Amino acid sequence: MSDSSQQGVPRVGVIGLGAMGQGTALALHESGLAVVGYDVSDRAREAFAAQGGQSAAEPAALVSCDIVLLLVVNGEQVEQVLFGEQGLVGRLTPGSLVIQCATVAPSQARRLGERLGAAGLALLDAPVSGGAAKARAGQLSVMASGDAAAFDQARPVLDAMAATVYRLGDAPGVGSSMKLVNQLLAGVHIATAAEAMALGIRLGLDPDTIYEVITHSAGNSWMFENRVPHILQGDYTPLSAVDIFVKDLNIVHETGRELAMSTPVAASALQQFTAAKGAGFGREDDSAVIKVYQRLSGIDLPEAANDPQGHDPKGNAPGGGA
């Protein structure tokens, strides 16, 4: 046990110091918890350390932690962190808690709970939502499931990182199921917002006026209101990338297939994000899905948003179509 644990303050490891992980780790640190952060990126670790956090050069430095928070990108990274060559399973002290926050398939979350349980470790299936700003403020929404002991053990961390914790069930998989519903809606809303803006621009409407009117009308959505400003500013710095929704909507599709349930609206959004990824925009902000419409219809996007391969000031589609 670490000194901090002996004094009643759990030692918390955060793996994944990207947009969400960096903010969450800093919120935990500023709440008084003993936090050590790890990321494969030197730049991410240095940024965390520059803001007062303690960073580690390798995952093995987190084996003394009582709680490990996973804020990685996907299920493959979860597997690598826990069961890979430098994996924490088998190194963490029995009774330690893993809080898994990545968006993964519900079936993977259930299997993960079984495997960690067999290793003497507890799992809280706890995907998050809210974005980088809320992560930094410790104001995330957490969709969690796990047994009562896991919730009790996680309480200091959840109190520091979340505005709302939804306690959804007593076993892993329920939290990930709810997150999948959220991601279906989020992905569809972003793709629809892009299509609506593209149509309005093609009709000759002023982009800023579209935003002003729609955000005060029944067609508004949280994603429209949050993402369209990125388009208006021509700023595609990724807060959540196109690649994320290619991954998440693929999980929606695969889960629907397992359940013999069609998800045609989500499938359409997935195709648009996949097209954006194929066009080279995978690492840009998810609002860059609008650039697919630019390439197809030649619309003139605001300022730096313009894609040189798709932009035609006469409004013609690429290839010279009328």
Task: Give the location of each predicted region.
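Rossmann-fold dinucleotide-binding core
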Residues: 103-183
